[in-house]
Amino acid sequence: MNTVRVAFLLVFVLAVSLGQADKDENRMEMQEKTEQGKSYLDFAENLLLQKLEELEAKLLEEDSEESRNSRQKRCIGEGVPCDENDSRCCSGLVCLKPTLHGIWYKSHYCYKK
């Protein structure tokens, strides 16, 4: 029975000592993997950032072109003098001669349709 105890004790000691070595080795492997993972994540993050910046630049460029081409010119509001030939009244307004002609300085004003 002593030989069984000695054999069991020997196996136990070997298992504990080898287990500790594996634990340290595993810890070192995990540290290496996390360091590699961090560098990979940094690379992926930089790549994603570049793509987002390119996309943002493209969108801003489209917006500026769109606003430049479709920008409404300044218009004249209701009750403001306008030129009969070059009517810049806002939408929904028309350049008309007022009914009481002698009161106003100009002869045409923007009125609602």
UniProtKB/Swiss-Prot annotation:
Protein name, entry field: U11-theraphotoxin-Hhn1x
- Annotated region Disordered: the residues are 61-85
The protein's superkingdom reads Eukaryota
Tissue specificity statement from the Swiss-Prot or TrEMBL entry: Expressed by the venom gland.
Q: Could you confirm whether the keyword Secreted appears in this record?
A: yes
Give the organism, scientific name. Cyriopagopus hainanus
Could you list this entry's UniProt keywords, alphabetically sorted.
Disulfide bond, Ion channel impairing toxin, Knottin, Secreted, Signal, Toxin
- Report the domain remarks: The presence of a 'disulfide through disulfide knot' structurally defines this protein as a knottin.
Q: What does this protein do?
A: Probable ion channel inhibitor.
InterPro entries named in the record: Toxin_22 (IPR012627)
To which protein family does this belong? Belongs to the neurotoxin 14 (magi-1) family. 01 (HNTX-16) subfamily.
Q: Name one Pfam family in it.
A: Toxin_22
Which positions are cleaved off as the propeptide during maturation? Answer: 22-74
Task: List the molecular function annotations (GO) for this entry.
Answer: sodium channel inhibitor activity; toxin activity
- Cysteine-cysteine disulfides: 75-90, 82-95, 89-110
Q: Signal peptide position in this chain? A: 1-21
